[in-house]
Amino acid sequence: KRVDFLNFAVSELSLKNAKAKHLRAEEAGEKLLRGSADVVVARAVGQTNILLELSIPLLKKHGIFINYKGKDLSDVETAKTAEAALNAKKTEVFNFCLPFDVGERNIVVYEKIEDTPKIYPRKFGTIKKNPL
């Protein structure tokens, strides 16, 4: 349903070169969409090192990964090994507070600086057991 809505929005807004697909990120990053996206977005769904391994392979060189996080950024600092292995670099962190005292949030932006080694992304079970 979410993908249907996103494709409807793309159509209504007459966006060119934009489409929503329902895929597992690790499958898309292996072959289908590897190196094809200008921007990948994730919202507070997991550890940063795991999200990087799933998202960075989808990006073109100099593409941007936008990671919407909660208040706690401790896992961002521990993801430096993943950044190096995947040829990505943290470029910006935007901190803000939601209205009505809902809480503090962060947007962490990464750039893919070189092609991702072909060994990434690994199978999801491997990523979970042995994160970068």
Show the residue positions of the predicted features.
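Conserved SAM/SAH cofactor-binding pocket of Class I
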Residues: 1-46, 52-55
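Short gly/pro/ser/thr-enriched loop/turn and capping motifs at secondary-structure boundaries
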Residues: 2, 72-75
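Active-site-proximal loop->helix
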Residues: 7-12, 76-86
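Conserved beta-strand segments of alpha/beta enzyme cores
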Residues: 17-19, 64, 89-92
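Short glycine-/small-residue-rich Rossmann-like dinucleotide-binding loops
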Residues: 44-45, 70, 114
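Helix-to-beta-strand junctions that scaffold the AdoMet/dcAdoMet cofactor pocket
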Residues: 59-61
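Short strand-turn motif at the edge of the Rossmann-like AdoMet-binding core
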Residues: 68-72, 96
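SAM/dcSAM-binding transferase cores
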Residues: 80-132
